[in-house]
Design a protein with these regions (language model features):
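Expand to "…catalyze enediolate/carbanion chemistry for C-C bond making/breaking, isomerization
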Residues: 1-162
Length: 162
């Protein structure tokens, strides 16, 4: 509901046992008297806020259920957007959607190799008593290192060799 979205940080941080939160898109649309659009633009703000508040509370953000099971291209685009918005995963309503979610949320070989390069460059910089380094012309800093570690963690969780 609208109140749930407004209070999403309070909900996300209400208990140490809380693992994830997500948007009930249809409930939200109904409460807000919104018509569902093909691109779900009417719920973009709520999706952003839920993801932001989940991360602020230190828990996972699970993206909403995409209910048009026949629109595979729309679903794929929606999963990509959810990942871009910081979602940790996506709820599904049909078994045919699982493969796309796994494909798009599992790190690619290229992402894994890049993460390894970043961590190696950072470790080399630390060995040389320098906390600052670059790789391929890009500065490597703590947020990049944290992201690289996260990518490798996701890859391990997916059963990939890293």
């Amino acid at each position: 509901t609208a109140l749930g979205v407004v209070n999403s940080y309070k909900i996300a941080s209400a208990s140490k046992r809380m693992l994830a939160i997500g948007l009930g898109a249809e409930d939200f649309r109904t409460d807000m008297r919104m018509e569902r659009s093909e691109d779900a633009s009417e719920i973009l703000f709520a999706r952003n806020l839920i993801s932001l508040n989940a991360h602020a509370a230190g828990i996972m953000a699970m993206d909403y259920v995409y209910s048009n099971i026949k629109n595979t291209e729309g679903f794929r685009a929606d999963v990509k957007l959810g990942k871009q918005l910081g979602y940790t995963g996506k709820s599904v309503v049909h078994p045919n959607q699982i493969g796309v979610v796994h494909e798009l949320y599992t790190p690619t070989i290229k992402e894994i190799e890049s993460a390894k390069e970043i961590l190696n460059a950072y470790e080399d910089a630390l060995k040389n008593a320098s906390g600052v380094t670059s790789l391929n012309g890009k500065m490597i800093d703590k947020p990049m290192v944290t992201r690289a570690m996260s990518i490798l963690s996701y890859a391990k969780a997916a059963g990939m060799e890293v």
